[in-house]
Amino acid sequence: RIQEFMIRPDKAKSFSEAMRICYIVIKNLSKIIKLRKLSTSVGDEGGFAPMISNNNQALDLIVLAIRKSGLVNGRDVSICLDVAANELNKKNKYSIHSKNYITVEKSINEYKKIINKYKIKSIEDPFAENDWLAWNKLMKSIKKVQIVGDDLYVTNLERLKKGFLNLSSNAILVKLNQIGTVSETLDVIKFAQII
């Protein structure tokens, strides 16, 4: 299943307002999770980690928390995904929703359904880091959604250049700890800003 579900406070006009919006949504999400008798314990990166059966259940909880906060999903606050598909990949088939592995084409159709139903605005690592063709197919079939390469690029300039030529994504997650030096990281940032 999808590794992380995130919220983006699109309505915010300042950093402090963004923090306030996220705080309110997270507080409401915590209340909803408790009411459903699910655990409000958090994972390594600080997100809730309740035992739920599928991605849609997690997304439904987040949409409800946004609504309970007096906000509109897809307008005031958007849901973003970190799929971490390297962990869901077996021979270029993916288990995005269940233990069953499906083709790239079926995976793209699943992403389209999720995007439309939940107004998803950003998907990070939707396919495995070396499945360049899948990334390209997704970019060609999904518009107006940020497709973020993290594991795809690992803040590596050569991989970013390949991704640019392949039309693999329209965003990159840059992490200093992935490449090794500050100058290499800055080179990646400069190239990403140009393209």
Report each predicted region and the residues it spans.
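Mobile "lid/hinge" segments at catalytic clefts and subdomain interfaces of large enzymes
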Residues: 1-43
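Short glycine-rich or small-residue beta-strand-to-loop segments that form or flank ligand, phosphate
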Residues: 6-8, 47-49, 171-175
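Active-site mouth loops of central-metabolism enzymes
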Residues: 8-21, 51, 95-105, 150-152
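Short, electropositive, low-hydrophobicity segments enriched in small/polar residues
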Residues: 41, 51, 184
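Conserved short loop/turn motifs at secondary-structure junctions
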Residues: 44-55, 124-126
